[in-house]
Amino acid sequence: MSNTDRLRRTEVVPLGNPTLRQISTVLATVVLAIVLISFRPFQPEGPAAAQGGDIVNQIGFGSLALLALFSLLTLADRRVVAMMVSPWWLIVFGFLALSVMHAIDPPSAMRAALFTAIGVLAIVTVLVLPRDAESFTTVLLVAGLAAVLLSYAGLILFPATAVHSGAGVEPQHAGLWRGAFSHKNVAGPVMACLSFAGLYAFRRGRRWAGGTLLVLAMIFMANTGSKTTAGLVPLSIVLVALPGIFGMRFLTPVIFMTMMIGAALATLGIVFIEPLKDLAQQVAPDLTYTGRTALWDFLGEMIAKKPWFGYGYESFWSTPFIYFMEQPFDRDWDIRGSVHGHNGYLDIAVLMGLPALAACLVAFWIVPVRDYMRTPRLKENIYLSDFFMMILMFTSLNAFLESFFLRRVDPVWLFFLMGCLGMRMAARIRIPSAWSG
């Protein structure tokens, strides 16, 4: 949000102008709606749906990048934009650039990284263009309701693509909702984050619109069939909101880090730590997270072969190296058909190396938690930081079972990025409630 009290106002652009305020809100809404819905909603199931290099996406997201860049240069306070730059995120993107350079197909990896950069630019635009909390709430509500209502409409108008069929490579997903999104594993987390947006709007006084978004998103999320998502959403809300209600907001960062460590031990720990592996075999011998443990064990072997720089961006999954790899008959998961490792943290390590993973953990966990602790004790800042922390907690936990980090313009990744960068903003500037003229 560009209109701040802590930073001096620029004398070049009259940021308080109500017309510019409305234009900024509209542009931020359009950008967020596009990254949520994309230029190609309701795509058929299968590998073709995952391809992002078609001409529609290239032209569409290229135009979106120009719109976002133009908006940042003409409508946003440049000092606020500069404030969004984080040293740790620069290190992360430096590792990304390095992994592009030693990819098996650098031009293809560069195109994928360019889409990732466009997504980052779009989220920064969504965060800094709105002049105040009221404008940002409007952006979330309009874009969120557009994505939710379009997905509901798809159930009626395009049932063959808005609902998973039993004819694809995943017949077990038949009947589960995915709406305008590429997969139920994308639709579920997006709806979860939109439910947090509805709750944020509700807390700020937008009762009807916020409550509507919250309920509609929760209902859709429940029909995506993801029990993990359905459980993590209320858990994230309670773990973030409850400490603040009892005046113990300082506990939220402790809870966050405890949850991350606990989730790491409960998922990766039972694969790579022998005592935990033995304990899991005794207590829950069938615990495989739907076969994911076999996939993670394979990833551990691959990471050990190239621990420093990994295999390169876009250079592991869905490559000939994987396609022609021998598949043991007793492995629970056929890795040749996987498009990712179902663990975002392991995927960073296998693509970019362990040093890159270490930098990502600092940027993803440590820096946002520090920012949350530094948030001013002002109503709008607290509401906003709680919203971002809910997103961050949910997506960080979800990443132990799914993979979306640094993944082009994946809306789950972009919501996660919004949580991280938004927390940075909430900690550093006073968020005005509404434009006061």
Which residue stretches match the model-derived regions?
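Alpha-helical transmembrane segments of multi-pass inner-membrane proteins
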Residues: L64-A65, L96-A97, T137-Q172, G179-I245, ...
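Hydrophobic transmembrane alpha-helices and their immediate junctions
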Residues: V128, R206-A209, L242, L351-S396, ...
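Long extracytoplasmic/lumenal interhelical loops at the membrane interface
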Residues: Q281-D297, K305, F309-M352, D371, ...
